[in-house]
Amino acid sequence: MNESFAEALAARTQDVLDNCTRCGRCFEVCPMTAPAGIAGKNAADVVGGVLDIIRGGSGSPASERWAQVCSGSGSCIPACPEAVNPRFMLALARVAMQRRASAEEQHKKGSAAFSKMGRGVRVLSRLQLPAGVLKRFRSEGPAETPPEVVFYTGCNVLKTPHIVLLALDILDALGVSYRVMGGPGDCCGVLQFRSGDLDASGRIAYHTTDRFAATGAGKVLAWCPTCTIQIGENVLPGRTGTPGAPAYDLEAFVVYLASQLDRLRPLMRHPVMKRVGLHEHPGVAGVCESAIRILQAIPGLQYVELAQPQVGYMCNTLQPLPAFKREVHRGILEAAAAAKVDALAGVYHACHRELCSHEADWPFEVVNFLELIGEAMGIRREDRFKRLKKMQDADAILVEVMDLVELHGLALEEVRAVIEKDLLGEQPLPLRSARVDRDAASAPG
């Protein structure tokens, strides 16, 4: 195990155990307890069970359930009177549960998850862009002078590369010097952390954060909320006061962009005459508020507030409760339709992958909010992921992307598997049109 990471995690774990008073306030404000069916449990007992799990005990079924369904909403953090981070506490509990398995099983599980993610990123990005454009996603070689910021993509946003291109276009227009880092080679280590393989997780995370420091940038702008939380809460606090302590600030890209609104506003010269609602997740503090501020600054755009549950930091964090996740998706689509929006805008890539194909069934477009900023600036990047996913036919998609398959030398069997699993397979709420097609096919002739 990476001893520095292990020691830091052990010390921070002890701080949680020492400082948590089991008041239960974090459990009481958690938005996931009702969907998980544990809202009526004694809060102090559930929290006490979580602490027992962290110590290596069995806890209780309710405590395990609470840890497993945590979606990282973050409402627990300001609620704690002892300044314990309950989101970190629940992450420690999940790690403790994973570490009941053998070290071999932990490593195998983490490696499998990493390989699956890497394959999806590699293939889907290449099915949308030629090699020359993909080079923009990873800065190579030393810079002559330190950049102002590192733009840290994380990994999975590269499956929807138009989002990354828009972010870089906006930074270019603002005149910000940056270095792009991300992809599996600069992973945050979260997949290994989730499997309990702390050796691999620490090694990967420390490699990436050391590379951030080597750029000399004073700020790292993280796109992905998973990376923001993994690095910002699980990794960097343990490096404080050590030789590896960061000399940079980690900030969510969207929050940074809102801080540059005075510079951004004059660049948004083209009216965007649309009613727009925002698909929100509260997990990373300030992101939704920042996105709304920016949308409200776009000329011609009418921002419409949509009723929606404040849960998770991205849609994929709701996966432990699939029925609840489907209801959340159905609810936001219905709210957008009721508000008569022209566009339902999301912030994050995972949400976009799961929701974008619903555009075929509803009277509004589903976009990333950066597309609206780009439109106001006269910048357009085609959302090829959405175009392909709306086809809903693996054979038709293969025909559409065959030129890029050949250009990148991809194996057809692998491409088909990724299309079926990673492109079409991520559909928590079935399309209404798909249900109609199924019903028609099964109707008696």
Predicted feature residues:
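Iron-sulfur (Fe-S) cluster-binding modules
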Residues: 1-28, 32, 98-102, 144-147, ...
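Conserved active-site and cofactor/substrate-binding residues in soluble primary-metabolism enzymes
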Residues: 21, 41, 45, 162, ...
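Local cysteine-cluster metal-coordination motifs and their immediate loop/turn environment
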Residues: 17-35, 67-84, 153-156, 184-196, ...
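Short, solvent-exposed polar/charged micro-motifs at secondary-structure junctions
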Residues: 190-191, 260-263, 314-318, 376-379
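Iron-sulfur-cluster electron-transfer modules
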Residues: 14-17, 41, 47-230, 234-238, ...
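Catalytic core of nucleotide-activated saccharide and alditol-phosphate transferases
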Residues: 249-261
